[in-house]
A protein has these predicted regions:
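Short, histidine-centered active-site or binding-site loop motifs used for metal coordination
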Residues: 8, 111, 147
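Short, intrinsically disordered, mixed-charge
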Residues: 92-99, 128-132
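Glycine-rich NAD(P)-binding loop of Rossmann-like domains
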Residues: 102-104, 152-155
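Mobile beta-alpha loop/short-helix "lid" or hinge segments that flank ligand
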Residues: 34-44, 132-150
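Short alpha-helical linear motifs
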Residues: 43, 109, 128-130, 148, ...
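A short small-residue
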Residues: 2-3, 106, 144-151
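Short, glycine-/small-residue-rich phosphate/pyrophosphate-handling segment
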Residues: 103-144
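N-terminal beta1-alpha1-beta2 submodule of the flavodoxin-like/Rossmannoid cofactor-binding fold
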Residues: 1-92, 96-97, 153-169
Length: 171
C-alpha cells in the first residue's frame, strides 16, 4: 500500500488548498493518507543568524514526514502570485537540512483559489522551481473558483472527472 503525505500550502484553519489536497489524496486507490497541517510546523522567520543556533525541530519533523511518503499530494495557496509566507519559510528551513528538501519524491501538484485563475501563478512557479528542490512532478491540477466547484466537500462532476484523470495518468 502506497503512503501519501498530503498538505495545503497555507496555515488557514479553513484552507481551501488543504481541502483540495485531502480530497485528491483520498482518490488514489490502495493508499494510506496522512494529511499534514502547516500549523504543526510553526517556525521562526528564517535567517542565517538564527540558523547558527540550529535548525528547529519542526523543520526536521516536516522533512522526516516528506521522507516517509511514497507520493506527495500538495495544493498551494497563492498569496500575491507566490507561495504563502509560512510555506516559503518552511521550505527555507528544510532546504538547510537538504537542498533537495522534497527528497526526489513523486509529487502531484495543485492549486486552487476563490478566483478564476485557480492559483495558476503559484502553480507555474512551483512546477518550475520544485524539481530543483527534489520534487518529481508527476502531474498538476488547477481548480478555479473553489467555492463554485467544491460543494459540501465534493467537487462538481466535471472537475472531479478531470482530477481523477490527472491522478490516473500518474500510474
Amino acid at each position: 500500500m502506497k503512503k501519501i503525505i498530503a498538505f495545503g500550502g497555507s496555515t488557514s484553519q479553513t484552507s481551501i488548498n488543504k481541502q483540495l489536497a485531502t480530497y485528491a489524496a483520498h482518490l488514489v486507490a490502495d493508499a494510506s493518507v496522512e494529511v499534514l497541517d502547516l500549523n504543526d510546523y510553526s517556525l521562526p522567520l528564517f535567517s542565517v543568524d538564527l540558523e547558527k543556533e540550529g535548525i528547529p525541530q519542526a523543520a526536521h519533523d516536516f522533512y522526516t514526514k516528506i521522507g516517509s511518503a511514497d507520493l506527495l499530494v500538495v495544493s498551494l495557496a497563492e498569496h500575491n502570485g507566490a507561495y504563502s509566507a509560512a510555506f516559503k519559510n518552511l521550505l527555507d528551513w528544510t532546504s538547510r537540512i537538504n537542498p533537495k528538501n522534497f527528497q526526489n519524491k513523486p509529487m502531484f501538484l495543485m492549486a486552487t483559489s476563490p478566483g478564476a485563475r485557480g492559483g495558476a501563478s503559484v502553480l507555474e512557479m512551483a512546477n518550475s522551481r520544485f524539481p530543483y528542490q527534489g520534487a518529481a512532478i508527476v502531474g498538476t491540477f488547477s481548480l478555479p473558483n473553489f467555492y463554485d466547484h467544491m460543494i459540501d466537500g465534493v467537487l462538481r462532476p466535471e472537475y472531479h472527472a478531470q482530477l481523477v484523470e490527472c491522478l490516473a495518468s500518474m500510474a
